[in-house]
Amino acid sequence: MSIQERPNRPARGGRGRYTPKRKICSFCAEKVSRIDYKDSAKLARYISDRGKIEPRRRTGTCARHQRALANAIKRARFIALMPFVSEHVRRQGNVATFSPMRELRPEPKVAEPKVEPKVEAKAEAAVPEVKAEVAPAAETSESAESA
């Protein structure tokens, strides 16, 4: 059986049967000359739920409009028209790092820094000196009383 007799199988080295529909740049289709950074509703379509700018392969924008789109989103974020992070990410924290297995694993022990009792050592050294000074004074007073 030759390759020409097998219509259901792709040719060797071929890409297969499924070919995704080619995405067309929406800005080129609408003939947009400039992407406005003030149009936050339109820019929000090109931001993921995590707050990241969507890549070209997902949005279908051309390279020229993807660069302009990224600059417009960055400008809108800088002047506080758009958030850097989505609201639910701000409330919940970094959900991507949460793992149920993390609770089962013991937390790694962190070595605590040793605090040397330098202050206490000086205080103890000072106390015997004071006693040594007091003791001879007591002896001299006793010797003075006995004399």
From Swiss-Prot:
Keywords: Ribonucleoprotein, Ribosomal protein, RNA-binding, rRNA-binding. GO terms for molecular function: small ribosomal subunit rRNA binding; structural constituent of ribosome. The keyword RNA-binding applies. It comes from the Bacteria. GO terms for cellular component: cytosolic small ribosomal subunit. InterPro entries: Ribosomal_bS18, Ribosomal_bS18_CS, Ribosomal_bS18_sf. One of its GO terms (biological process) is translation. The keyword Nuclease does not apply. Binds as a heterodimer with protein bS6 to the central domain of the 16S rRNA, where it helps stabilize the platform of the 30S subunit. Part of the 30S ribosomal subunit. Forms a tight heterodimer with protein bS6. Belongs to the bacterial ribosomal protein bS18 family. This is Small ribosomal subunit protein bS18.
